[in-house]
Amino acid sequence: MIAPDLTMDIPTELGRVHFVGIGGSGMSGIARLFLAAGHRVTGSDSRDSDAVQALRELGAEIHVGHDAAHVGDADALVVTGALWQDNPEYVLAKERGLPILHRSQALAWLISGQRLVAVAGAHGKTTSTGMIVTALLEAGRDPSFVNGGVIGGLGVSSAPGSEELFVVEADESDGSFLLYDTSVALITNVDADHLDHYGSHEAFDDAFVRFASAASELVVISSDDPGARRVTARIEGRVVTFGEDPAADIRITDIVTDGPVAFTLTHDGVSRRAALRVPGRHNAINAAGAYAVLVGLGVDPDDAIAGLAGFSGTGRRFELHAEVRGVSVYDDYAHHPTEVRAALEAARTVVGEGRIIAVHQPHLYSRTRMMAGDFARVYEELADHTIVLDVFGAREDPIPGVTGALVSECFEDAGHVDYLPDWQEAADRAAEIARDGDFIVTLSCGDVYRIIPQVIAALERPAGSPQPAASSRPRE
């Protein structure tokens, strides 16, 4: 994979910008903002998608597939770290000496000079960002924003606003969250992840200390998460903590998780009851952090509570795709044991007497090797049956011996897990197990959501009908 130079000097003018992998959730949102700012935008992606079509309608010229000719007369290239070094567009740009910007560099360049709210953390970034944006709009504010997922009720992951206020989901996975000139920083947690990039837990913590220390106005940070507490102890300036911890500046109590979550927030001696439209204890925690940011931005506390109640979720966060013969099919972006636990606990609060059939696609070979046992323990505790697919490698080369079988082999009861690298077999198995009232939940930040049409088709197939041919995953 490529390693963009995050320290490079960016030209004052970028001219025509070419995005490689423009259909991705983060890239498409940034491309939308470049279009809104009047830039000529071109791009390429491995496949067509709704995001690609939406950008075309806004004026972007987008090619399906990768070819050096697609670069055309571009003045700069925008990429992610999940790009192979032999990508022909990247190779040509290097040969021409074009500026090659990481997506976060491009965004930081575009929004320079604005008051910036940056949301970081190993888990909960996308949801927390969506909550802040939704509540600001409900309160009559008009920020610009870019999120890692489509925000429910808005139908987009990014949009320009009329205020000099920008809300961004900041990606810590490769250190690029340190590029922003942050005014208000929200740190949801500092649960060690991405150690393939950082190398150690200490280096991971250090990055968050740098991120928080750079915030010019306010740091909002969890008081429940041990990693966040380590960071808090090392930073100065205005800090507001949130959580169930009795010492938190904004304390969460009386959480009710039977269906959409409800809870009490106590701040400056005043307690307010809050309710959300999304399930899960973790979303009460996310909402508390968002509330702290909103109040820090000058939103009236009661308006902040009302605005959070309008949040209806984000794409790929416990997202319902279909209900077939009484079986609900959900997708969730969870790709770390902590996130999987939160997603399955949320599912458990709404499934009632039904069962949870989890379809897990391990993400990254390094994470699978390091956390296979942790994943297995969470799934065995909270899912009634788990189907494990093979590893989605993303930016990594395969590691010998590391497959999805590592996860399934860690289950204490082999009767509650299947390792099925063939996607059609996995879809058929999920449909075979499921009965009226059950949930089938796909979990990964890879492309596991693309198995959902196969799952739906398997659920709709009459008993005894011929099975489709095997397939490792849907074709591009």
UniProtKB/Swiss-Prot annotation:
Query: Lineage from the top down?
Result: Bacteria, Bacillati, Actinomycetota, Actinomycetes, Micrococcales
* SUPFAM superfamilies associated with the record: MurCD N-terminal domain (SSF51984), MurD-like peptide ligases, catalytic domain (SSF53623), MurD-like peptide ligases, peptide-binding domain (SSF53244)
Q: Which GO terms describe its cellular component?
A: cytoplasm
Which top-level group of life is the source organism from? Bacteria
* Family as reported in the entry's similarity comment: Belongs to the MurCDEF family.
One GO biological process term:
cell division
Pathway membership: Cell wall biogenesis; peptidoglycan biosynthesis
Described function: Cell wall formation.
What's the main place this protein lives? cytoplasm
Catalytic activity reported: UDP-N-acetyl-alpha-D-muramate + L-alanine + ATP = UDP-N-acetyl-alpha-D-muramoyl-L-alanine + ADP + phosphate + H(+)
In its UniProt entry, what is this protein called? UDP-N-acetylmuramate--L-alanine ligase
Segments traversing the membrane: none
Which keywords does the record carry? ATP-binding, Cell cycle, Cell division, Cell shape, Cell wall biogenesis/degradation, Cytoplasm, Ligase, Nucleotide-binding, Peptidoglycan synthesis
Residue positions annotated to bind ATP are G121, A122, H123, G124, K125, T126, T127
Keyword hit for Nucleotide-binding: yes
Enzyme Commission number: 6.3.2.8
List where in the cell it is found. Cytoplasm
> From which source organism is this entry?
Clavibacter michiganensis subsp. michiganensis (strain NCPPB 382)
Write one Gene Ontology MF term: UDP-N-acetylmuramate-L-alanine ligase activity
